[in-house]
Swiss-Prot record:
Glycans are attached at N296, N427. This is Cytochrome P450 monooxygenase notH'. One of its GO terms (molecular function) is iron ion binding. Its main location: membrane. Its cofactor is heme. SUPFAM superfamilies: Cytochrome P450 (SSF48264). The keyword Hydrolase does not apply. Heme binds at C440. Gene3D superfamilies: Cytochrome P450. It comes from Aspergillus versicolor. The gene is notH'.
Amino acid sequence: MAQDTALHLPLGLEPAGWALALLTSSIIYLFLSPKSKSPRFPVVNKYWWDFFQAKAKRDFEAGAEDLIKLGLSKARTKPRREYPRLVLSDQLADAVGMDNRFDQDKGIAPVNLVTLKGFESMYAGALHDSVPRPATSATSKRLVHLTRPFSEETTDFLQREWTESPDWHDIEVYPVISRLTAQVLSRAFVGPRLCRDTRWLEIATTYISNRLTAVVAVQKWGAVLHPIVHWFLPSCRRLRAQNKRARELLQPELDRIKESPLEDETFTSLAWIHGYGQGYIYDPGLAQLRLSAVANHTTSDMMTKTLIRICENPELIQPLREEAIEAVRGGGLRVAALQKMFLMESVMQESQRLEPFILLSMFRYATETVTLPEGTTIPKGTLLAIANPSRLDPAIYPDPHKFDGYRFVRMREDPRHAHLAPFTKTNSTNLNFGHGKQACPGRFIAVNQIKIALCHMLLKYDIELVEECPSQLVRSGLVTVRNPGAKIRVRRRQEEVCL
């Protein structure tokens, strides 16, 4: 039988210091939805005497990955207890991912607080909630037209932020990458005017952390008080003000779209959603905030980790440059050129294999009782998620804890594992983008955007790690990030080809 366990994750943890860790608090709450009905599986991190969950909170924040491993190992024995969230092994990812009876929206609903004013951007069922997936898919189909605009925004950003100076200077990695990602993706989301507007970029880079801060603040109070306290909490007021500001900034762009519909060459998801939503009442500001929440954080995290990995392994820099030069020479920086960059993709994928942003994936809700092919029965109402132990399976990845930038290049040449090599092809060993029918439709955009950015960075700049600023992994609950204070040192160099 596949391994599965019910993982007891404590409610109300608020990590301090920086915004990314706030996501942990929301995920903790999600795992303790009191309305869920879990099957009889082993429970970990639950103590009968821990009435206020103090020990459970500390243990989860410090060692969520170890708790997941413990739960999966316990699942080899007879199921014995009940608790809210069921954690399944990735052996069941195919079955869960392809079954429509496991609902994604309801799987993450406990953290959304969607009935409160200001939190509506995640509201399940509203048009501004249902539109991001088809809008993202539509954007992915325009990648051939978006490659040049993405490159233009990357050039503009690096000239301003990394400068043209030939002297070494320090760059704080995550904040800079977050701003770069926001500007580039906003070119596809809201167009060339707003993508460089500092007012919009401030919203794009802070919305998700502001929302999560507000969620944590509300969750400190009993559920019966939520409809009242949110009106007075400063974080909730800031969130409502940010929603209002987003609408104000988007309205002039919407007016232009109504007067002159955009062609593929100037495609924006804002224009696409406007056409998609004809005849419906919807909030374009909330729709764009939802897209930003989905895209900016995870893409920035992936690019940050990849860039730091490259700096930690400087022997990769020249081969990566040579691959990019060979791919770009003759045809320019096009989708076809990006698809030839197998080493760059391997480095990105190896980084994500070892450093997934979230240790669990595929959060789902069972809308009816489901018996999986291997015999596990999931009762109706169960909240579940998928762990990904296969990413460290030595039978698939020899020496699995070692970073190997060429790992997936070699896998492409191995008939046994060639199907696992493409980064954007989801499978049970690679759940970074989810899996199955509800896999992330924006993964093609994210991978292309990161490749474009890395081409510009590596060809135009010398880069090295600033050793005095620790760049180690920081774990908080389910979230794994690089130290937000990590820095690299850069200086301008002459690129060999024109980008």
